[in-house]
Amino acid sequence: MPLSGMAIAFKASTSACTAQQLWGHPTRDQCQYGFTHLNERKSRKGSAALHARAVSGKLDLDFSDPSWKQKYQEDWDRRFSLPHITDVFDLEPRLTTFSLKKNSDASSPDKWNGYVNKDDRALLKVINYASNTSAGAECIDPDCSWVEHWVHRAGPRKEIYYEPEEVKAAIVTCGGLCPGLNDVIRQIVFTLEIYGVKNIVGIQFGYRGFFEKGLKEMPLSRDVVENINLAGGSFLGVSRGGAKTSEIVDSIQARRIDMLFVIGGNGSHAGANAIHEECRKRKLKVSVVAVPKTIDNDILFMDKTFGFDTAVEEAQRAINSAYIEARSAYHGVGLVKLMGRSTGFIAMHASLSSGQIDVCLIPEVSFTLDGEHGVLSHLEHLLETKGFCVVCVAEGAGQDLLQKSNATDASGNVILSDFGVHMQQKIKKHFKDIGVLADVKYIDPTYMVRACRANASDAILCTVLGQNAVHGAFAGFSGITSGICNTHYAFLPITEVITTPKHVNPNSRMWHRCLTSTGQPDFH
């Protein structure tokens, strides 16, 4: 499958998931954590027969069976086991070359080197919901029974499966720009050198660098990448789309690459997994490890992805400008459009953190513009009562109100209609029609929020993710990604991460907090 089609395949696989419901919660965030979904079926006598099917896999659960929890957890453990090169090759591990001891003659406990036991696990879900009516409840059964969800803890292992001096490692950055890309590249190089790897290269301009003539490998070392974190963008360059998976693996094989680090979002992760599978098919001893990158924060199971905090921080600058413009004008309306194709995390968090937003519109929550309970009517009320207002919209919001397009970009993403411009025009027309003066200022900081340098919070996250990606590769894992889950760093199989994108849960406490802050009503 061409990698440019990976995003299409990824999005198509989500439709069935988002159409279902959690028990008693018809939201668009059913798949946020990948737990099983429930269906209630009425029997002929009118009683409810309860069944569940896992989001991934073919597991059917009968909750009247006392062993259903055990079956569920066994299925979870199977799904979240990490692919390893020993699944294909008969290899013996060797002692790691990763050491933080500066004096080779000094003896110290293993814990001083920060080794992680291969059986360490991190708990993914920590809230024990008492009822399926609790805000944000994610329930497997109608009683919201507690079931543990464990994932593999990330970090350096005491045993490795590669000889560092023989390793050739490659790094590629895919998709769009994101604050922190250079921080991740830098830490991957630093950590590889600590292990003893001498041959490190960068693949220029995404997957395109594997096949485009004239794009040569870029030799990387600590000296080369020492200060690249001081600037935004990608030191290696980025691009969307790419060649067929087989052509990329042909290039990997010809270049004798042993480790490939893919920094990218959902589509790039799907591509990385396809590369991993093709390498396995050809019996190539190649570890493919991904690092989740997206300012949209829509990677499943992750607390957050790098670049998100920086994007929210930068978005506040635009919101503050819109606030000042609106506050200073007679009947001023500030309108800000933020990134978020299918998720409203940036818009929600920027609205919360700024405290200046009166209306926040996101893709996960439907709304109407016209009518007594529409957005425009509420804006009328705001101008009458406080004299001005500020509106924040995610780019993917309100697409059902616009003419749909079948056009796609190089990554296979549907090109969205510009709701921000549509909203601006609707506001102007509405107030003109009712004879009220409205001074509308529209701000679109789309590329400003992603082209900047990572802030301190994201820089730390990037540092750890880059280091853990290398630890995962040397531990022999492939087809995995490194992320932060429930405040702990973990390794996850890419196959589970790309099941569906993460969405804002309209029943969650965070969205409720946003509504409390804005004071906006339901727009229906």
Annotate each predicted stretch with a short phrase.
Residues 437-452:
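Active-site pocket-lining segment
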Residues 403-408, 450-460, 492-500:
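Short glycine/threonine-rich loop-to-helix capping motif typified by GTGT followed
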Residues 335-342, 395, 444-447, 483-491:
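A glycine-rich phosphate-binding loop feature that marks nucleotide/adenosyl-phosphate handling sites
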Residues 2-172, 183, 194, 198-199, ...:
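N-terminal low-complexity/intrinsically disordered extensions
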